[in-house]
From Swiss-Prot:
Keywords: Electron transport, Membrane, Mitochondrion, NAD, Respiratory chain, Translocase, Transmembrane, Transmembrane helix, Transport, Ubiquinone. It comes from Fasciola hepatica. Signal peptide: none annotated. Belongs to the complex I subunit 3 family. InterPro entries: NADH_UbQ/plastoQ_OxRdtase_su3 (IPR000440), NDAH_ubi_oxred_su3_sf (IPR038430). Its EC number is 7.1.1.2. One of its GO terms (molecular function) is NADH dehydrogenase (ubiquinone) activity. This is NADH-ubiquinone oxidoreductase chain 3. The keyword Transcription does not apply. It is a multi-pass membrane protein. The keyword Magnesium does not apply. One of its GO terms (cellular component) is mitochondrial membrane.
Length: 118
């Protein structure tokens, strides 16, 4: 038992050292990037940017992402109910989850976060 504990600690130590080494290695400025850094940008067609260009996610995209995560969670919970054999034991907690999800969706529609026409 002690052997496995020492082996696990040794593995963790080696993993941590490799992780720290790579973190320092990738963050070193070796003079390669000291000049113009625009060639590293996402515009590889010769476009030289004179200012910082950032891509921001739109709020609509973020809301769509949240909807996807919540409804994916709902589907994964509901599809597993018959397979778990606990359909009637946890039915009210699943029903509460669906009601809470529906109320949240109605609040978002009411406040205008969800627009069906673009």
């Amino acid at each position: 038992m002690l052997f496995f504990a020492v082996l696990g600690l040794l593995f963790f130590l080696i993993f941590f050292l490799v992780l720290v080494f790579h973190a320092f290695l990738w963050n070193l400025d070796l003079g390669i990037f000291s000049g113009e850094r625009s060639w590293v940008s996402s515009f590889e067609c010769g476009f030289l940017s004179q200012r910082v260009t950032e891509n921001y996610f739109s709020y609509t995209y973020f809301i769509l992402l949240v909807f996807f995560v919540v409804f994916d969670l709902e589907v994964s919970l509901l599809l597993n109910m018959p397979l778990q054999g606990v359909l009637y034991k946890n039915f009210f907690s699943y029903l509460f989850f669906l009601v809470l999800l529906g109320i949240g969706f109605l609040v978002e529609v009411r406040r205008g976060y969800v627009r069906w026409a673009y």
